[in-house]
């Protein structure tokens, strides 16, 4: 597509076409697996369309982005991220029966640079932490934060993303409100 956006190297607008290809592969390796609640609509499927199983798993993701721009520049990245996810509870009881905690670290190799400010790959080392907690019934609260942990980056130690979400989740639908303090946006 053709884009008009702020240039990465100046305050001027750049007007260039941009084409990209993205690929991603996820994997999960269970280290410990508990038992689900009885597989009935009143228990395991009370608030969720799938049975929540307590456990500990290692998750990983490999993705690549190949981007070409109208001025001849290219930006190519390959990223690897992973970490543990701990799930406690079955999300079938009325109070505090589901907690999920995730920690994810990641690194990115980059070749070239984007002429645009909005898609410049600058966070090449990241650390993220997220938690989801059942409060009462189908009411969940989630929060997450990601940091730049690349010591060679001028943004080292900066928050690169954050979110807070309150969600009402039932077996066949969910409704939520989120707010992203980093971006200053929210929605339903």
What are these language model-derived features?
Residues 1-188:
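Outer-membrane beta-barrel proteins and related beta-barrel translocases across Gram-negative bacteria
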